[in-house]
UniProtKB/Swiss-Prot annotation:
Cited function: GTPase that plays an essential role in the late steps of ribosome biogenesis.
Xref: PROSITE patterns: G_ENGA
Binding residue positions for GTP 1: 10-17, 57-61, 120-123
Pfam families linked: KH_dom-like, MMR_HSR1
Subunit structure: Associates with the 50S ribosomal subunit.
Organism from which the protein derives: Alkaliphilus metalliredigens (strain QYMF)
GO annotation (BP), single: ribosome biogenesis
GO molecular function: GTP binding; ribosome binding
Gene: der
UniProt name for this protein: GTPase Der
HAMAP family: GTPase_Der (MF_00195)
């Protein structure tokens, strides 16, 4: 089941990124005392009292100029309404209530989704005046916090997890293959959905951000049940051009959470972009099957080496997806489209595959003989044995003498040997290490 999504919204410089960093426990966003400075990662996985959720910092889509702040805040609120299960509406207790605060509060109230009002900067004076002022918003009791000092953060998190839905979204049977179509706007995601379905079930336009909602489309190919999850575009075209791609990253997060296999759609006319790397990273980190789909291949002038050049670029820019197959298609002309669903089915089976413990340990033993494990200060890594702990993604438990001796490069080596012998194409592989002595 997908993890709940929590969005922090509010006007620039109220402390959204500081709160985001305080909650996740380390500083990954750029924080300065100027509006519009968050330029880095905008999501993180959070655990609080055995509740797991995805936290989104909409500070990553703040405007840089005061003139467009009201419009920007409305877009933030709309994003939260469409995507988040719980919205934290952050206001500045020092500055007091603003017209923009009132406008966004009205939108959030109409959404009928849980909204928590966080009054920041309570470590300053005159907070009581602001406290009662914010009751005008009609969102409920302000939760007093100081994101800079860490005051009240635990109370806020307690309230957040209380409002999580019991069932996150539609629950499909385990045998239904859930496929998320992800990628930046205007790469042809909806056209791919339509081509797979063979009918026009999703509105398609050449204008980025015209898909009206995230649309789940169940269908049967005669053998298996599928659900295509088409990530939503903007409900309306953003007034700020740069926001469109950032919004779609956040919407992709929600789709990836629910998926078994992700189709990462790349525009052949543009190549791999920064946003492609962000969305691809989220799919990889969440253990999803991934297929890299290069769309609009019909628009590319080709010679004998064109495809190889594209493959090299993709493997360089998305090196962590070395396991992901690459398909070159045209949703418009249906070039190689039958291969897409065929590959989805194959990757889904690869994610669910189990290998025998005996065969696994033969591969590991042979690998350690061919390439001796690393050592440090005279102590050498020993892999006593391994077993497959789980599937989706395939996860292996290795019993070793010292976790600190397992270098990333050697883990990659073991992973490659496992892939060479058993497959697992299109899916990440995870390792869990358990320490034991040779006498155990």
């Amino acid at each position: 089941m997908a993890k709940p999504i929590v969005a922090i919204v509010g006007r620039p410089n109220v402390g959204k990124s500081t709160l985001f960093n305080k909650i996740i426990g380390h500083r990954i966003s750029i924080v300065e005392d100027q509006p519009g400075v968050t330029r880095d990662r905008i999501y993180a996985e959070v655990e609080w009292l055995d509740h797991y959720f995805t936290l989104i910092d909409t500070g990553g889509i703040d405007a840089d100029t005061e003139e467009i702040i009201p419009a920007q805040m409305r877009e933030q609120a709309q994003l939260a309404i469409e995507t988040a299960d719980v919205t934290v509406f952050m206001v500045d207790g020092r500055a007091g209530l603003t017209t923009s605060d009132r406008e966004v509060a009205e939108m959030l109230r109409k959404s009928h989704k849980p909204v928590l009002l966080a009054m920041n900067k309570v470590d300053t004076s005159n907070r009581l005046d602001s406290f009662y002022e914010f009751y005008e918003l009609g969102i409920g009791d302000p939760i007093e916090i100081s994101s800079a000092q860490g005051l009240g953060i635990g109370d806020l998190l307690d309230e957040i997890v209380k409002h999580f839905p019991e069932n996150k979204g539609v629950i499909y049977d385990d045998d239904v293959i859930k496929v998320a179509i992800i990628g930046k706007p205007n790469v042809g995601k909806s056209s791919i959905v339509n081509s797979i379905l063979g009918e026009n079930r999703v509105i398609v336009s050449d204008i980025a951000g015209t898909t009206r909602d995230a649309i789940d489309t169940p269908f049967n190919d005669g053998e298996d049940q599928y659900v295509l999850i088409d990530t939503a575009g903007l409900r309306r075209k953003s007034k700020i051009k740069e926001n469109i791609e950032k919004y779609s990253v956040i919407r992709s997060i929600a789709a990836v959470e629910r998926a078994d296999v992700c189709l990462l759609v790349i525009d052949a006319t543009e190549g791999v972009t920064e946003q492609d790397t962000k969305v691809a990273g989220f799919s990889h980190e969440n253990g999803k099957g991934t297929i890299i789909v290069v769309n609009k291949w019909d628009l590319i002038e080709k010679d004998n080496n064109t495809m190889n050049k594209f493959i090299k670029e993709i493997r360089t820019e998305l090196a962590y997806l070395s396991y992901a197959p690459i398909l070159f298609i045209s949703a418009l002309t249906r070039q190689r489209m039958p291969k897409v669903l065929e590959t989805v089915k194959f990757i889904s089976n690869q994610r669910a595959m189990r290998v025998p413990t005996g065969g696994l340990n033969e591969v590991i033993g042979e690998a350690t003989l061919l390439n001796q494990p690393p050592s440090d200060k005279g102590k050498r890594l020993k892999i006593f044995y391994g077993t497959q702990g789980s599937i989706k993604p395939p996860t292996f438990v290795l019993f070793i003498n010292d976790k600190k001796l397992m270098h990333f490069s050697y883990e990659r080596y073991i992973e490659n040997r496992i892939r060479e012998n058993f497959g697992f194409e299109g899916t990440p592989i995870r390792f869990i290490y358990r320490e034991k002595s040779g006498r155990d």
